[in-house]
Amino acid sequence: SLLLGCGLPGGMMGSMMADLGGIRQTINNLRKKKGEPELSMDDMLVKLFDEVAYVWPRVGYPPLVTPFSQYTKNIALMNLLTMEQGKGRFVMMDDNMWGMILGKSGKVPGKIDEELVALAKKQGREFTDVDPHTLLKDSLDDFRKEMDENGWEYGQDDEELFELAMHPEQYRNYKSGQAKKNFLA
């Protein structure tokens, strides 16, 4: 029921527990200096779930799928640390977290909390409602050129072209024979 309350997917438990272990050590060092009792892993897990439940609506209820579930969890995790340091919430957020909040990955379904809107303005960050797909360069012609230069066939229905476009490194290794060498090594 703890996972249901905060909304995080169960598949995140492994990485979340690893992240929590490192932060727990830092938080317990801070608590020790203040003469406060250490927190168990169970205590930290409950605190994290509670903080995710606090953060999620404030960042606009992003869908809790990769990468947004990680960003939401990371904001909550950093909040636990910065609150223990006496700095408050939303102090340590990287560009990926801000990108989600600002709309650079698309519009989140809910409203961004006024505290975060004010913090973004204070930091000189700008919200956008531009469709992020319109910012991507159309690279298909570059991949066509590469295939032509290498004498590679496009394949039926351009399937080879699309394979190169979707997995360039793996495709190049396959065509050069490097993938087979790596497999047999």
Predicted segments, located by residue:
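Terminal or standalone catalytic/regulatory effector modules within metabolic enzymes
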Residues: 2-185
